[in-house]
């Protein structure tokens, strides 16, 4: 589980809670921020619209469950991916491309394994690139469906919050005879806006951005795999392949890999 995401969500809730209970009425003031009707309008309305936008109810449930992906730690590290490819290039250089089939059995990543098998089968390099890039596009499209789901819900929350506020204001204006009810009724009307803003900024926007960040990382790593595998197929030197793949990385990450490689070489010596 990605602890950062969980801690962030919990911290947001704690900050809102503290903002409420540190007011003049302390814990008693918490009751002012609860209104069942406002919850029905904001949450129920926004969820209903998201169901309408979904291809099916099953797809809606699937998109809701994608929140688990935001909680998942991205296992593929840049340095690890590059080292795996360099190891494969060394195997291919010493034993030939066909030896990669046995090496593929120890690879957990399905995308990398598929690319290796294409090389072993002797597929044309341009066709290899086309097949792998097509799969990359399909992965990106699937991920973007989940990202857009949460981004769209982030827009629906405040919109339905405003609808609830307008409903509350209409009810308030119909009861203007009793001036003592204006303040409480106005407060209730504003709660739907608060709920909508919390739904968007506490949950939907952060989840959408986290999924987007995870997708960008995964796509970048798979692009590294594509270039690495095609370089192996072309018979390039492992050192050349390593330097080529490092060009995908930030300078700080490259430096980290160089330091780790230097430490490993020192240990072997």
What are these regions (language model features)?
Residues 3-8, 18-146, 218-269:
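Large intracellular
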Residues 7-10, 14-30, 137-214:
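Helix-termination/interfacial motifs at the ends of transmembrane alpha-helices
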């Amino acid at each position: 589980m990605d602890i950062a995401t969980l801690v962030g969500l919990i911290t947001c809730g704690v900050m809102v809670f503290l903002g409420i209970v540190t007011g003049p009425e302390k814990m008693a003031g918490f009751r002012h921020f609860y209104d069942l009707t406002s919850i029905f309008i904001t949450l129920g309305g926004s969820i209903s619209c998201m169901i309408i936008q979904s291809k099916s109810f099953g797809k809606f449930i699937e998109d809701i469950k994608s929140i688990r992906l935001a909680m998942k730690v991205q296992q593929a590290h840049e340095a690890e991916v590059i080292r795996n490819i360099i190891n494969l290039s060394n195997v291919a250089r010493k034993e030939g491309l066909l030896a990669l089939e046995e090496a593929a059995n120890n690879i957990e990543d399905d995308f990398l394994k598929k690319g290796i098998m294409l090389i072993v089968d002797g597929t044309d390099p341009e066709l290899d690139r086309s097949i792998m890039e097509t799969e990359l596009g399909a992965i990106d499209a699937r991920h973007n469906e989940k990202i857009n789901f949460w981004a769209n819900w982030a827009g629906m929350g405040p919109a339905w919050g405003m609808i609830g506020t307008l409903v509350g204001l209409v009810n308030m204006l119909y009861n203007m005879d009793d001036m003592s009810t204006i303040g409480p009724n106005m407060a209730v009307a504003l709660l739907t806006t608060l709920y909508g803003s919390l739904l968007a900024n506490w949950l939907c926007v952060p989840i959408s951005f986290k999924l987007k960040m995870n997708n960008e990382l995964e796509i970048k790593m798979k692009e590294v795999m594509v270039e690495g595998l095609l370089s192996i197929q072309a018979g390039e030197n492992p050192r050349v392949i390593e330097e080529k793949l490092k060009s995908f990385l930030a300078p700080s990450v490259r430096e980290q890999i160089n330091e780790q490689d230097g430490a490993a070489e020192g240990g072997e010596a």
